[in-house]
């Protein structure tokens, strides 16, 4: 049977990618062995035979035996013209084609992948794709769609129409320029041809080991998993099995997007047996006897729990339940190829330029959210807060559509931002520490989004000063995530100031540490607190095993603070620097300072308020001072500063002087209200004359003599949690 060049099956391609995930070899390493190494005997000019190709795969994939069907399919995909299977071992393939293909899979640019696939299907090498070559491309796309479980009965005419649209000049053939233009704008060619493979809903469960605090029953054999015994639970559908039953489990019921036009727009219930943790039916309000056998049903989208007998009364359509405002149901996500031709032409993606060519799986799907909802884009840093991050990740994968939840350790925030780029009225939830939040805000800056979404924070780990100021707390402690999502629905938007930091070093032989950030979200400081943080940072990098618990960290921090109070390494700081606020010098001559902090938010070091609470006495003078404090760009008058309240969005910074480590400790333990209020300003410049410790948002470094300019950069919409019943929060959040 003859087979055309390039038509490797999607399942073979998926298997190849799995091999590549575990391989540490690079194509360049293998090529050296063929060009002048032990594999040179297999080289015939620039070609290799089937045996040489098998050796290439064996070395590159680091496996002893590549399945014969896979190696033959790959070998045949690189052959020109037709072949007879009986004589496959006598044929050869071009080594440069093979190396180019695997290099692209390693991480080639999208435009390179597009150009390679064009040449792969241009079998007569005339620089255009004629009708027969386009037909072969459509065949491959159909096979890919079938592998992805799409409804292929409606797809062929859609693909034919799409391929006609690619022929922009109507010549009857497709040039390389037209192919690249289409791939860069409206058509997800790489996905449709199988070179991007994360679209597959493969029916596989996402298992995690779990010990059950109550009697549960295996979804497969229906026998009990003993109290306190370990079984496996699927993160996506809550299907539960014994360890030994996992291999025979039914496929996962969760499909994350619509695969047919008839499924777009209307979401159906997806019922899974068991998993009725509340023990009460949401239909009849009677008990579900979950302790006696595998009974009841739960919907993976609206999370309703019902008796088996109540199912006929439930209806077909699912409204996604209490969390509908946040959820993108599968009916709202569908392959962009299923959009009408006019929709593809007017797609916002088509406005992208060739310089921004980054079509990915996300852009192969279109999102049409349910009206009057605010879909939630969730970023999780699994490393934050010990194991908290991992638990939060799989909990959100169940509560929401898994395609809304992104693991930052895999590909960072960019895939999520691209996926949601054109979604109206969406929100972002960042699960991590202040550093993770800063990473997301910087990525939003770079993404040049048409709509900048408001950002909420689920704080993981310790510190979390920004989350404290935004009323999301100092750290997640296992609270009900559904309750947190309901709080998010009633949150308010505040536009938080962000500040640019420019460090201009003086000519000196001393070498400075790299500046950790160019943007301030929380605070900047010079002197004593930065010195303590820097010593802590250096010691933790040198001896990480000594910093493996919160209690140890606190003890080390206390030790460094104590030694700093004894040696006072930043004593008489005012002699080593000068400060200008909006071009005017700040007088420090009457003060003996060891540190200066510049605050954008009224929380540092895990909840310390260096600015202090603002008293609100009555009287005309107070009213005048308060009015001045709310409007002036520069304030240094002590009486007016007493009335100033920190504000995240007033485009001004608070400047505080610190006498030493003891004073910082007193503020931290609430024995002292605040440091010395020095100024409130919209721009500040430091000139230093010696090497000093500094920090931005908790990241310390040693800086040689320099000039530091801090200016307003922009504002970012942030979500403020609902007011607590009894609030001790400060400033405008009181």
Curated annotation (Swiss-Prot):
InterPro entries in the record: ATP-NAD_kinase_N (IPR017438), C1-like_sf (IPR046349), C1_DGKalpha_rpt2 (IPR047469), DAG_kinase_typeI_N (IPR029477), DGK (IPR037607), DGK_typeI_N_sf (IPR038199), Diacylglycerol_kin_accessory (IPR000756), Diacylglycerol_kinase_cat_dom (IPR001206)
GO CC aspect terms: cytosol; plasma membrane
Binding site for Ca(2+) 1: 122, 124, 126, 133
Enzyme Commission numbers on file: 2.7.1.107, 2.7.1.93
Pathway: Lipid metabolism; glycerolipid metabolism
Domain EF-hand: 109-144, 154-189
Alphabetized CDD domains for the sequence: C1_DGKalpha_rpt2, EFh
One of the GO BP terms on file: phosphatidic acid biosynthetic process
Protein task: Diacylglycerol kinase that converts diacylglycerol/DAG into phosphatidic acid/phosphatidate/PA and regulates the respective levels of these two bioactive lipids. Thereby, acts as a central switch between the signaling pathways activated by these second messengers with different cellular targets and opposite effects in numerous biological processes. Also plays an important role in the biosynthesis of complex lipids. Can also phosphorylate 1-alkyl-2-acylglycerol in vitro as efficiently as diacylglycerol provided it contains an arachidonoyl group.
Name of the featured protein: Diacylglycerol kinase alpha
Record organism: Bos taurus (Bovine)
Gene from which the chain derives: DGKA
